A protein has these predicted regions:
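Conserved phosphate/anionic-ligand binding catalytic regions in large, soluble enzymes, centered on
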Residues: 153-170
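Long, Pro/Ser/Thr-rich low-complexity/intrinsically disordered regulatory tracts in eukaryotic proteins
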Residues: 1-151, 166, 180, 184-187, ...
Length: 351
């Protein structure tokens, strides 16, 4: 089954995809910081039961992963592939996660709060993600009684999620704005509207892959629709600015834009050993080439999916052991050679 981040919509614009998070605590249990192991296990069993009972309605099958039974790199791989919201995960708890087969829905149990429902969507479809998250929320609420106050909304241990208990974010690919050295200025402007804009991936460069995450900072006093509408508006403005800059650069010197894209393709397609940051830089160029129709139409290049799957922890998880830096370099090159299509030069878009 194709994962949500492998869908074509992830490559059709500066907005790669979106995620909605609903944070919930369950009546009858103390907050996570005060729970003992028995309570955490009981809560996990209750949530697993609720999810299993909801599979038919949601038309999704879920896999359960208990973090006490997996290695660190396997848990890190789930975080790297966006199944686990890193801001909600806290190591050391009796925690687990239920993930749908396409990885579009995950339910984190015993993170920093009792529950975090996460729904991911490709492209600019945050409203659809919000609707699906609401459906999951309603299904689970039939079996779990949420801690809720008429005055404060959903009760959480962190004031960040008090109110709707909802957070939403978009992943954006912004290489042309980045080249213009305006990202810090944009981050300040975005913060005035109650949102953050930060590099998504960790690496030695400032923003590996030129991928950024825009997220709301607060939920109290705001409705879910207000949060998602503001996010859509701000992300849409950034996407328009990115596309306008790209068009300007292509109109001024198309060859100057296209040549590095083909060089990047050749490097990572045929290399035998690849470092993380250099690969991210090349994949960013491939993503821009896909977005601006450089590659043949039948060439299925999914740069964002490759970004996720060639991360260190994901490569270790695929090898089923914690591999060395040198082994990761070889494994990364092997993975990319297998998953990037061979381009027919006769079908390539003319520069």
């Amino acid at each position: 089954m194709r994962k949500w981040y492998e869908m074509e919509a992830c490559n059709q614009g500066p907005i790669i995809g979106g995620q909605v998070y609903l944070v919930r605590n369950i009546m009858g249990y103390p907050f996570e910081a005060k729970m003992n192991e028995e309570e955490q296990k009981a809560l996990m069993a209750a949530v697993c039961y609720a999810v299993r009972q909801s599979e038919e309605v949601l038309q999704k099958k879920f896999v359960f992963i208990n973090f006490s039974e997996v290695r660190d790199y396997e848990q890190q791989a789930l975080t790297g592939k966006l199944a686990i919201p890193p801001q909600m995960f806290e190591k050391g708890h009796e925690a687990g996660i239920l993930i749908s087969e396409d990885e579009s829905i995950s339910v984190l149990v015993n993170g920093k709060e009792h529950l975090c429902i996460q729904v991911s969507c490709p492209g600019n479809h945050i409203q659809e993600a919000m609707a699906l998250a609401g459906q999951v929320d309603d299904c689970l609420n039939q079996y779990l009684k949420y801690a809720f106050s008429k005055k404060y909304g959903y009760l959480t241990s962190s004031p960040l999620y008090m109110g709707t208990g909802m957070s939403a974010s978009y992943l954006l690919h912004l290489p042309y704005l980045e080249k213009k050295s305006v990202m810090h200025q944009i981050e300040k402007q975005i913060s005035q509207y109650g949102f953050t804009l930060r590099p998504h991936f960790d690496g030695q460069t400032e923003a590996p892959g030129s991928v950024y995450r825009m997220r709301n900072r607060k939920t109290l006093g705001l409705s879910e629709s207000e949060i998602t509408s503001a996010l859509e508006h701000l992300a849409g403005q950034l996407a328009e600015q990115e596309e306008a800059l790209a068009r300007q650069c292509f109109n001024e010197d198309r060859l100057c834009q296209v040549d590095p894209m083909y060089r990047a393709y050749g490097l990572i397609k045929y290399a035998r050993k690849l470092g993380y940051d250099e690969t991210m830089a090349c994949l960013s160029l491939l993503h821009a080439g896909d977005l601006y129709h450089i590659w043949p139409e039948q060439a299925e290049i999914c740069p964002f999916a490759v970004m996720l799957n060639m991360a260190d922890a994901v490569l270790s998880a695929s090898a089923e052991k914690n591999i060395s830096s040198s082994e990761r370099g070889r494994a990364r090159a092997d993975y990319i050679r297998r998953n990037l299509p061979v381009l027919d030069a006769s079908e390539a878009v003319s520069s």
